[in-house]
Amino acid sequence: MVVDDEPDVEALFRQQFRRDLRAGRFLMEFASSAPLALQRAAEIGDATLILILSDINMPGMSGLEMLPIVRSARPDVPVIMITAYGDAETKRKALEKGAADLLTKPIDFAALRQEIDARLEQAA
C-alpha cells in the first residue's frame, strides 16, 4: 500500500510498476491520507498486505504519527517511510517509531522493486 496525499504519486507508482501490475505479480493499493491507510490496513487480509510505503509530510495525521499505530495493528507488515527530507534526524525519528527504512525523493525505484521482490518471496 502506498500512502501519499499527492495525487501524482499514484500515477508515478503505477507507471513504474506497470509490468508487474499487468502481470499480476502483486496488487498496489493507494491511500490519500494516514487515517484512510489505517482503515485499509485493518481491512486487508493478512497475507495480501506485504508492505506499506508512506510519505511523512501529509496534512492532518503525518506519516510519522501513523507509523506506531499501524505497526501496533499490523506488526507483520514493514513500513518504509518516504520523504523529501533525508536528514539524519528524520531518519532517526522514523526508525525509532518502527520504520523498516527511509527512502528519500526522488525514489530509487530499482531498489524499491528489490524490496518488493524480497517481501513477495517471504510471503510465498
Roles of regions detected by a PLM:
Residues 105:
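A Lys-centered signature of the CheY-like receiver
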Residues 65, 72, 86-101, 114:
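Alpha4 helix (beta4-alpha4-beta5 surface) of REC/receiver domains from two-component response regulators
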Residues 1-18, 28-30, 34, 52:
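Conserved acidic segment of CheY-like receiver
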Residues 112-124:
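Receiver (REC) domain switch/output surface
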Residues 33-36, 62-65:
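Acidic catalytic/metal-coordinating carboxylates
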Residues 46-53:
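Active-site beta3 strand of CheY-like receiver
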Residues 58:
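Receiver (REC) domain active-site loop signature in two-component systems and cognate sites
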